[in-house]
């Protein structure tokens, strides 16, 4: 069983959260929109509303305690990149970030994904 953090609860993030829950993993889900967090409460271990580009908020989650951190933010590549970079700075063991284009993948890989 892994302890997993998922940041970004659009369709992709919710799908990953559901699958990991079904596999028996502990899932912490985060999004800045309350209605998205409400959608996952029934099948994740814990969920919080918050801004993942805020280092203090991320630090409060205890980033080093997660085996894997997924960044599934789809509506803002800038936020995805900032979140990925902050996660690595805060001691994330493994960061897997969503990229829609090759150039995004390159930026994410250079910044901690």
Give the label of every model feature segment.
Residues 1-113:
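Cytosolic regulatory regions of ion transport systems
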């Amino acid at each position: 069983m892994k302890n997993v953090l998922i940041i970004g609860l659009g369709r992709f993030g919710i799908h990953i959260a559901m699958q990991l829950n079904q596999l028996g993993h502990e899932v912490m889900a985060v999004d800045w929109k309350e209605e998205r967090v409400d959608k996952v409460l029934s099948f994740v271990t814990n969920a919080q509303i918050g801004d993942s580009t805020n280092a203090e908020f991320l630090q409060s989650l205890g980033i080093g305690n997660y085996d894997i951190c997924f960044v599934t933010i789809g509506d803002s590549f800038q936020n995805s990149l900032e979140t990925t970079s902050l996660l690595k700075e805060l001691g994330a063991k493994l960061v897997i970030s969503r990229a829609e284009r090759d150039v995004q993948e390159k930026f994410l890989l250079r910044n901690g994904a």
